[in-house]
């Protein structure tokens, strides 16, 4: 029995999901939190039961050792030999990695070299890769990049209107993120629609604390709302999304903050938190708006307004849309936001049923049968995409 483990390593966390392949059955999943801090938390689900331990885990290598030991202790696996593939989520692949790759020493060096494009994420991703390679050196390891799916964007979509030499010399361009999620839901939408993805025009809305929209034509990403970094695009939980770049020196002058401090504000104190002054959590804002809090209502309106701008422009970009897909925490669970986004799209041929919209986290169509444009909730499954890519590369390696 072959097992593949999908890994998402953060700076102080390690999420994992173990699959039986090729059946794609989830065997177990869990997370190690607060790595390198006192009272680290190890959580694993075994036979539907969540087991939680508080234990000191000083670094990622110890976290990986512990994870593998727990898999054996809880009889999830009989020996390490059962694990035949490891897939690692890597946030930034730049232009170097247009698809998932087998990890060797050179690939690790290249991912490290791309760290200046994703200083918060890539170093953590590499730490996870190295920890697993040290303990399971002979198992096929694969890197799956958040940016890879968007590498099909044409130059007119990814170039900024800056001196062209900035792109040539420094790699300044739109990269886009959440690619694994956009790819998964676009392929799943094609299955649900019973049509080849190659003939579809899809608008995928990955709406979570981080949010991005993508225009997917013929199974390929043509454009997406995030940019050089995940700060661009729509308003998010704490991120501003697109702003006039001249605001940065203006804010510096007015507040005495450095460029780095302003960037910190744009990343961590803006978006729905910044506008509402209450919370970055959409559920809190929905509750407050229902009680008549104007600022909470305004934060939600700004979020929806920015989503509308992308839906309109991407529909024009693809000369029409066959389906709109909602995914991720907000997209899957907030009937309120879906309703606000869908209201006013009738001109595009979107006719949706309010009764069907009262659902959380399950896969379903929201449109009336006669609606030319279909509307679908598809819970994302980035871990499964990672496991599938491992399978593909394992067969070719």
Curated annotation (Swiss-Prot):
User: Subcellular location, in the record's words?
Assistant: Cytoplasm
User: What is one process in the GO biological process aspect for this record?
Assistant: acetyl-CoA biosynthetic process
Q: In which domain of life is the source organism classified?
A: Bacteria
- InterPro entries, per database record: Ac/propionate_kinase, Aliphatic_acid_kin_short-chain, Aliphatic_acid_kinase_CS, ATPase_NBD
User: At which positions is ATP bound?
Assistant: 15, 206-210, 281-283, 329-333
UniProt pathway annotation: Metabolic intermediate biosynthesis; acetyl-CoA biosynthesis; acetyl-CoA from acetate: step 1/2
SUPFAM superfamilies this protein is in? Actin-like ATPase domain
Keywords from the named record: ATP-binding, Cytoplasm, Kinase, Magnesium, Metal-binding, Nucleotide-binding, Transferase
Q: Per UniProt, where does substrate bind? A: 89
> GO cellular component annotations, sorted alphabetically?
cytoplasm
The molecular function terms in GO held by this entry are: acetate kinase activity; ATP binding; magnesium ion binding
Q: Chief location of this protein?
A: cytoplasm
Catalytic activity, as annotated: acetate + ATP = acetyl phosphate + ADP
**Active-site residues, Swiss-Prot/TrEMBL:** 146
The answer on whether this UniProt entry bears the keyword Magnesium reads: yes
Is the keyword ATP-binding in the record?
A: yes
E.C. number(s) listed in UniProt: 2.7.2.1
Which residues of this UniProt protein bind Mg(2+)?
8, 382
What the protein does comes down to: Catalyzes the formation of acetyl phosphate from acetate and ATP. Can also catalyze the reverse reaction.
Q: Which NCBIfam families match?
A: ackA
Provide the assembly information.
Homodimer.
Q: Which family does it belong to?
A: Belongs to the acetokinase family.
* Identification of the protein by name: Acetate kinase 1
Source taxonomy lineage?
Bacteria, Bacillati, Bacillota, Bacilli, Bacillales
Q: What gene name does this entry carry?
A: ackA1
